[in-house]
């Protein structure tokens, strides 16, 4: 999937994958992973997710990485918050207190960039990628985060003949194939999305969809 695909989606406001509110599963299940702590959080392929403000409001330093400059700017403008902008290579950094969005290619991150990270929140990264890119995404993620980093992962599964992603369908079995060798995986929720759910109706999912929530801890 080329960079231009995502730049075009953001430029044309074709962002049906964006949630305009805090994700309910984050709200419900984050304490299971993070407890009452305020460890630093990495949000890959973060877009302009409101979830980052929710995490920041609970004391977590945030590093998000996002390819689209439009998304980075919108994130702060829509919250009516100012960010300092620091151009650089391979990332331009948008900063507001200890909330940062790094604008650039996720695959350019190196371990030193995330050495202080202890938590990862992935609601829209794995499911944003087509099947042929997911192994590379996971391999890179597990290579750049510290070994004691814990992950909250949210996935979506549906009949792929009914809808063309993104978001793409990711089965529970695929999560275990991608992460199972190195991580203890706990599926904390699996819930069917009703056929009359606005997202399912908008995208033509006549058979609905299934959402899953996982916590991952290094073995």
Curated annotation (Swiss-Prot):
Places the protein is found: Cytoplasm
One Pfam family named in its UniProt record: TPMT
Residues annotated to bind S-adenosyl-L-methionine: 10, 45, 66, 123
Q: What's the superkingdom here?
A: Bacteria
> Transmembrane stretches, by residue range?
none
Task: For this UniProt record, give its keywords in alphabetical order, as a comma-separated list.
Answer: Cytoplasm, Methyltransferase, S-adenosyl-L-methionine, Transferase
Q: Name one GO cellular component term.
A: cytoplasm
Q: Name one GO biological process term.
A: methylation
* Reaction equations catalysed: S-adenosyl-L-methionine + a thiopurine = S-adenosyl-L-homocysteine + a thiopurine S-methylether
**Recorded family membership:** Belongs to the class I-like SAM-binding methyltransferase superfamily. TPMT family.
Do you know which PANTHER family this protein is assigned to? THIOPURINE S-METHYLTRANSFERASE (PTHR10259:SF11)
The name on file for this protein is: Thiopurine S-methyltransferase
Protein source organism: Marinobacter nauticus (strain ATCC 700491 / DSM 11845 / VT8) (Marinobacter aquaeolei)
